[in-house]
Swiss-Prot record:
Obligatory cofactor(s): Mg(2+)
PANTHER family: PHENYLALANINE--TRNA LIGASE BETA SUBUNIT (PTHR10947:SF0), PHENYLALANYL-TRNA SYNTHETASE BETA CHAIN AND LEUCINE-RICH REPEAT-CONTAINING PROTEIN 47 (PTHR10947)
Coiled-coil zones: none
Ranges for domain FDX-ACB: 694-787
Organism: Ehrlichia ruminantium (strain Welgevonden)
UniProt entry keywords in alphabetical sequence: Aminoacyl-tRNA synthetase, ATP-binding, Cytoplasm, Ligase, Magnesium, Metal-binding, Nucleotide-binding, Protein biosynthesis, RNA-binding, tRNA-binding
GO molecular function, one term: ATP binding
Summary of subunit composition and partner proteins: Tetramer of two alpha and two beta subunits.
Protein name, UniProt field: Phenylalanine--tRNA ligase beta subunit
Limits of the B5 domain: 398-474
GO cellular component, one term: phenylalanine-tRNA ligase complex
Annotated EC: 6.1.1.20
Taxonomic lineage of the native organism: Bacteria, Pseudomonadati, Pseudomonadota, Alphaproteobacteria, Rickettsiales
Any matching Pfam family: tRNA_synthFbeta
Length: 789
């Protein structure tokens, strides 16, 4: 939002300096992007041409003498319209031309020195769209004085207005906010005094509304679309708006002053009635910016009885009925439509205009009549004409919002020392109506132009904003003595990173067809409006997304990967607030990069088994606390996978992926994976166990048993441990063998057992007795036979 200081002063009565106003704007949340004092434009002055002679060496050049009120300058000019007595604009030596940033220097043109340049409208950046002027700019005698700066030196302020403050997209709204913050007083604009004596006829153009909104209009006949007044051109130029014609410039001025977009139609091009409706089917539209747009069902249009489209409502008008210099009869429209409808319409054709930018951020629906009357008054003043009575149609009613507001909440939330009277004044200054202000709870009605004030805490924010954020007292946050345990997820991340894995974060969506291959065809949560067809299901398992990551990495030549993700999974029974978190990991390729010291190998089930139990170990769940059962999941290898149970609850699985799944993702090597269902694991004590010093030496003994291939080896380990829990510290398998020397259907399973006592050194007899118990238990429980060396 750009405006000049003098424009602001039209509505704000204050003696405050420019620096103070800029500082206050930032303090109240209206961020100042820039302030341009236009020093670079002060070198363009109004001059009078006092002599013109032909150039002695060039037919198309003329040597001119121009007077700036102080001295005379010689300028070589090629314009065909230069003549003695005319007023034009001289760019002094050192000036920078606005159009192309050319720096003017002393030049010698065909042997004649030139001290400056006489400028055209185009070079000055003020060429009008319909202008046919050629050559240098010619100024009227009574508007400009010789020697004065052509451009106004009025400082231009540019603000970055946030989307919720559409009311400040007009200079009047900015002045109102400054006045509310104590910077001067807001000057009153009495729109009720605007009346027209010659509204004795009814508009020949009717309006019909088939969408939610309000439309008002007035027909003005017999206008003269003359040149725009100098002051208005300067205001528009300062805002970066090109002057088009007097009528168009007036409605742009109303929009920039009061945040009230309007639209003008050439009334002679409209067949009887304007109908505001949505489009039934796609249609091409030729806009007044000389571009074609393909309109769809999102667009609201204004169409006449001849089915000609005259505008995309709130966005842009048509080329056919735009207002030109020779237009005599106009229809002036002032409308309000649902901001969402305008936003959708604008985005459909990928066009944002000054009008749509404001309408989609909400404009005051109560200001239509006054805005229309003000625009009509200015058009009659500068262009003449005879207006009709105002025609109006609406199917939207703006209802006031009543907010229960406690003034004490400002002090409690904002930690400020502010009186009830000050709070009352601030609310009234921004346009609120305050009732019951003698009670503890006030009834506050926000003004119609503040769509962002919807809750009582919005009012608290408004008071604090105007009172000054710098006045909020420092209030140190109280320090609690409660010690919180480290976040479990962060702990698990550290563990898996130490395992050489890399964390990834993927979408919560996945592909339905792939999920079905994993057996997820029921209790799944489909997405009604997916981002694309490959993300049409809330993921029932993180594994699906990790496999997609592996597949994409392989396509880029990354043939070794170990990745994990901690995230949520979803099913049809999931509700808001569920925390169905899992830890999922995948390994692919070789376990180590190729190196000089070790021979790499392909990853296998034991790599992910280690990852799985590292996660459980971090949750203080030991290996001996869980049960391993051969997995029946269709997407896992039937002989190289296991489901893990804790207290008879399935808490996860690990293993090698089934070859058919590997083929589905077009992955070239076997993949091993794991998934821990964190949400199924009961709350456990995450505190670290105290360190226990081991004072006495351990003893290791190895045993090799012949057992049936059908024996659950996990059970074998557990039985061995239970024979003497006081002395047996650990039992692990270090070899499994079948083949030569072993009967068919049998396995040789080698156990390594560690013995240790916490209070003495073990003697040989104790070790022998404990070993005999192990041999006896395995012999009785599994028909195991101890192998001799």
């Amino acid at each position: 939002m750009r405006f000049t200081l003098s424009w602001l002063m039209q509505y704000l009565d204050t003696d405050a300096s420019l620096d103070f106003i800029i500082s206050k704007l930032s303090d109240i949340g209206l961020e100042v992007d820039s302030v341009d004092c236009k020093k670079h434009l002060q070198s363009f002055v109004v001059v009078e041409v006092i002599d013109v002679v032909p150039h002695h060496a060039a037919d198309k050049l003329k040597v001119c003498q121009v007077y700036d009120g102080v001295q005379t300058f010689q300028v070589v000019c090629g314009a065909s319209n230069v003549k003695v007595g005319m007023k034009s604009v001289l760019a002094y030596v050192g000036s920078v031309i606005p159009k192309n940033q050319t720096v003017i220097k002393v030049a010698k043109l065909r042997g004649v020195d030139s001290y400056g340049m006489l400028c055209s409208r185009d070079e000055l950046g003020i060429a009008e769209n319909d202008s046919t002027d050629e050559g240098i700019i010619e100024l009227s005698d009574n508007t400009y004085n010789v020697g004065e700066s052509f451009f106004s030196c009025d400082p231009v302020i540019e603000l970055n207005i946030t989307p919720n403050r559409g009311d400040c997209l007009g200079v009047y709204g900015i002045a109102r906010d400054l006045a509310a913050a104590g910077v001067g007083k807001l000057k009153s604009v009495n729109f009720c005094d605007i009346t027209f004596d010659n509204t004795c006829y009814i508009s020949p153009i009717e309006i019909c509304l088939e969408v939610q909104g309000i439309v008002k209009g007035v027909y003005i006949k017999g206008i003269r679309n003359c040149e725009t007044p100098k002051w208005l051109k300067e205001y528009l130029f300062s805002c970066g708006v090109k002057s088009i014609s007097c009528v168009v410039d007036i409605i742009n001025y109303i929009m920039l002053s009061f945040n009230r977009p309007l639209h003008i139609y050439d009334a002679d091009k409209i067949a009887g009635k304007l109908v505001f409706r949505k489009i039934d089917d796609q249609i091409e539209f030729f806009a007044l910016n000389d571009k074609k747009y393909l309109l769809g069902k999102e667009n609201i249009i204004a169409v006449d009885l001849a089915n000609r489209i005259h505008s995309i409502v709130g966005v842009i008008g048509s080329e056919y009925s735009k207002c030109l210099f020779d237009t005599e009869n106009i229809f002036l429209e002032c409308a309000w439509f649902d901001p969402v409808d305008i936003a959708l319409s604008s985005r459909k054709i990928k066009l944002s205009t000054d009008s749509s930018y404001r309408l989609e951020r909400f404009v005051d629906p109560e200001f239509l009549q006054d805005g229309l009357k003000l625009a009509t008054k200015m058009i009659l003043e500068y262009c003449g004409g005879s207006p009709s009575s105002i025609v109006s149609v609406q199917n939207y009613v703006h209802n006031d919002i009543l907010l229960n507001f406690s003034p004490d909440s400002v002090r409690n939330i904002g930690s400020v020392s502010i009186t009830r009277d000050e709070i009352f004044d601030f609310l009234c200054n921004i346009g609120c109506v305050v009732k019951n202000h003698d009670c503890d709870i006030w009834i506050v009605i926000p003004p119609s132009w503040r769509s962002d004030l919807k809750h009582s805490f919005d009012l608290v924010e408004e008071v604090l904003r105007l009172y000054g954020y710098d006045k909020i007292l420092e209030n140190p946050i109280p320090i609690s003595n409660i010690e919180f345990p480290d976040n479990l997820h962060n702990k698990l991340r550290s563990v898996l990173l130490s395992q050489g894995m890399t964390e990834v974060v993927t979408w919560s969506f996945t592909n339905l067809e792939f999920a079905k291959k994993f057996g997820y065809d029921s209790d799944i949560m489909l997405i009604d409006n997916p981002i694309n067809n490959n993300m049409n299901l809330m993921r029932p398992s993180v594994l699906l997304n990790l496999l997609q990551v592996i597949s994409e990495n392989q396509a880029y030549g990354n043939n070794d990967a170990a990745i994990f993700e901690i995230g949520q999974i979803y099913n049809i029974n999931s509700v808001c607030g569920d925390n169905n978190y899992v830890v999922s990991g995948v390994r692919y390729g070789d376990n180590l990069p190729r190196n000089f010291y070790k021979t790499d190998r392909s990853v296998d089930i034991f790599d992910v088994k280690s990852d799985f139990f590292k996660v459980l170990q971090e949750m203080n769940i030991g290996y001996d606390s869980v049960d391993l059962v051969r997995s029946t999941k269709s997407y896992l290898h039937p002989m190289k996978s296991a489901d893990v149970y804790f207290n008879n609850i399935l808490i996860g699985y690990f293993g090698e992926l089934h070859p058919s799944i590997v083929h589905l993702y077009e992955i070239k090597r076997p993949i091993v994976c794991f998934e821990v269902f964190l949400y199924k694991i009961p709350v456990v004590d995450l505190t670290r166990k105290e360190f226990v010093e081991l004072r006495y030496q351990s003893v290791k003994r190895d045993f090799a048993f012949l057992v049936s291939k059908n024996v659950n080896i996990q059970c074998l380990i557990e039985v061995a441990k239970k024979t003497n829990v006081q002395l047996i510290e650990d039992v692990s398998i270090f070899d499994i063998y079948e083949g030569n020397g072993i009967d068919k259907g049998m396995l040789s399973v080698a156990l390594s057992v560690t013995f240790r006592s916490v209070d003495h050194t073990l003697n040989d007899q104790e070790i022998k007795d404990a070993s005999d118990l192990i041999i006896s238990a395995i012999s009785k429980g599994f028909n195991g036979i101890l192998r001799s060396c």
